[in-house]
């Protein structure tokens, strides 16, 4: 899947700005630091996530554009929706509950079994039951890919973000192996310490090691890396790892963040940004200095050799 988290997802209060315009001066009220991805129509995992973590975002095909639209698949009497066609996804909803016994006879078309998710739409209280409606478990797209936003922090949690992947996870790279190393190089500002790093796990049960190079001269410097964190994540997704002890950065000097990642059952564990299609035509390869390696010894330039940017972010705080 593609998970676009431009810069860092920064929620804002939409009532201040309206729904029909984009305001480049939006003021962030929170920073998203973690999002889990549940794939392959894993309905039980989605239910568990709703129960333990809150609403789960998912995508469907909708033949409606607002609450007043006519629809072949939406039953207004029961506030229920079931699509069994081949059109691709075009609308997001949030799963907030479920009913295993919800009758399949409540839909315009009849699914093979009972059961439905309770979903929150974005079309106001005139739609469905005060904005909520049922979607059959057997809808063509429900839960194909679901996202759980699991870590929101205050907007002042870090002072600066270093990154080259402003479009986020667009594709994957690897060396026909479940493990790989990837790194990004940045130039530090003044009076900064490295507090956290963020990256994508492209599959479940991913283990990681985070290294830092505080004095980067060239790619040979990547061998002088210092282990600063390690762990495992349950699902694919976007994760921020706080360092147990912040690393002081030299003013105006280059530093590197290196990730050693292992993702079972994949040959391409590295998330990258590249020019894939019309949705990513704002891709800028000139803003990054990334490196890729199988075992952390021989390195390739992400930009020169693979025409991509590595999805890896560094967060710093100002030291007084």
Walk through the language-model features, giving the residues of each.
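Short beta-strand-to-coil "C-cap" segments at the C-terminal boundary of structured domains/repeats
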Residues: 150-154, 215, 312-320
């Amino acid at each position: 899947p593609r998970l676009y988290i431009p810069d860092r997802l920064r929620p804002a209060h939409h009532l201040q700005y309206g729904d029909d315009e984009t305001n480049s001066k939006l003021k962030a009220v929170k920073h998203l630091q973690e999002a889990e991805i549940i794939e392959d129509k894993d309905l039980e995992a989605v239910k568990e996530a709703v129960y333990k973590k809150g609403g789960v975002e998912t995508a469907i095909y909708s033949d409606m554009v607002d609450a007043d639209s006519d629809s072949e698949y939406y039953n207004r009497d029961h506030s229920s929706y079931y699509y069994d066609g081949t059109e691709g996804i075009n609308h997001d909803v949030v799963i907030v509950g479920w009913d295993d016994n919800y009758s399949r006879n409540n839909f315009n078309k009849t699914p093979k079994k009972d059961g439905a998710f309770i979903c929150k739409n974005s079309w106001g209280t005139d739609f469905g039951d005060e904005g909520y409606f049922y979607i059959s478990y057997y809808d063509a797209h429900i839960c194909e890919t679901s996202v759980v936003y699991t870590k929101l922090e205050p907007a002042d949690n870090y002072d600066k973000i270093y990154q080259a992947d402003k479009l986020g996870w667009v594709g994957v790279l690897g060396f026909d192996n479940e493990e790989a190393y990837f790194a990004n190089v940045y130039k530090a500002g003044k009076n900064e310490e490295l507090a956290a790093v963020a990256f994508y796990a492209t599959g479940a049960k991913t283990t990681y090691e985070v290294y830092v190079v505080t004095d980067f001269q060239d790619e040979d410097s990547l061998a002088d890396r210092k282990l600063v964190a390690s762990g495992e994540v349950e699902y694919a997704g976007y994760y921020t790892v706080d360092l147990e002890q912040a690393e002081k950065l030299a003013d105006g000097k280059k530093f590197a963040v290196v990730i050693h990642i292992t993702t079972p059952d994949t040959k391409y564990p590295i998330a990258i940004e590249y020019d894939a299609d019309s949705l990513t035509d704002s891709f800028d390869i000139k803003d990054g200095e990334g490196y890729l390696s199988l075992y952390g010894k021989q390195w390739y330039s992400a930009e020169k050799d693979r025409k991509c940017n590595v999805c890896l972010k560094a967060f710093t705080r100002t030291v007084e």
